[in-house]
């Protein structure tokens, strides 16, 4: 049985820790919030998963990141993308030298300043270590409650992928493998932008036609952006792509969808973010992708309009009107 360390005691870190313990794995969870760790030790996480009953004393807690990495064989990165560099820097400076350790990333997003997905940030600090990403339609709240869920482990090493697949899989958590790491991470990052758009639509009422069009045309943009960077088209048609896009655009658990809904009801972005407990990665990813797509000349009209609503004060209904009245064209083109 491998020793597993989870870095980050947010909703995902807590949910995956519970899942792994339920799956008879040995887990230590680290976070810099000592109060949160004490709660987890007592069997709860009132900040991120307040209704969840945790297996008290079965999850080891550790407030020192160096201690948490001692004897670790699998390290799970469960921190927001905008903070992942800080955590990776701590690991780089730690005593961890065993290159057999496998890192499993759970974060979905693109770093706002350097426009990098998690695997590219990881390479800057821990090149040479094993790395893969777990992604797909998997809200932490449902995983923690053992709701049947299917996900993808994406990584360049098939043997590592298969090993992690076996460790994580259970009767309620089915893991597929995919060697398209780039495609898996880009899918998980960019769908958050479009979830904001879906929330905007929800705020206006039951606009089912509009939401169906948004999801479908958003997938086209994800494929354009992802294949530009070498992702495989079939990845975007699978769990990491369309699967995650659908659940994020439709679920009441979606933080990014919530942001869009509040925007369409007239609340400012600043106020929305101040009131949220958890991070809405799509807000930051929208800026990174907008600037990158503009620079690379990748056509992403929906993502561009969502960026304008977030950062340029464009009225959501105006953004929809401008999308609907663009030049007419064929549905499919190269």
Curated annotation (Swiss-Prot):
Broad EC category: oxidoreductase
Predominant location category: cytoplasm
Compartments where found: Cytoplasm
Disulphide connectivity of cysteines: none
Pfam families cross-referenced by the UniProt entry: NAD_Gly3P_dh_C, NAD_Gly3P_dh_N
Ligand binding (NADPH): 11-12, 32, 108, 140, 255, 279, 281
Active site residues of this protein: 191
GO biological process, one term: phospholipid biosynthetic process
Binding site for sn-glycerol 3-phosphate: 108, 136, 138, 191, 244, 254-256
A GO CC term attached to the entry: cytosol
Keywords: Cytoplasm, Lipid biosynthesis, Lipid metabolism, NAD, NADP, Nucleotide-binding, Oxidoreductase, Phospholipid biosynthesis, Phospholipid metabolism
Involved pathway(s): Membrane lipid metabolism; glycerophospholipid metabolism
Annotated EC: 1.1.1.94
Catalytic reaction equation(s): sn-glycerol 3-phosphate + NAD(+) = dihydroxyacetone phosphate + NADH + H(+); sn-glycerol 3-phosphate + NADP(+) = dihydroxyacetone phosphate + NADPH + H(+)
MF terms (GO), sorted A to Z: glycerol-3-phosphate dehydrogenase [NAD(P)+] activity; NAD binding
Recorded family membership: Belongs to the NAD-dependent glycerol-3-phosphate dehydrogenase family.
Protein's job: Catalyzes the reduction of the glycolytic intermediate dihydroxyacetone phosphate (DHAP) to sn-glycerol 3-phosphate (G3P), the key precursor for phospholipid synthesis.
Protein name: Glycerol-3-phosphate dehydrogenase [NAD(P)+]
Taxonomic classification: Bacteria, Thermotogati, Thermotogota, Thermotogae, Petrotogales
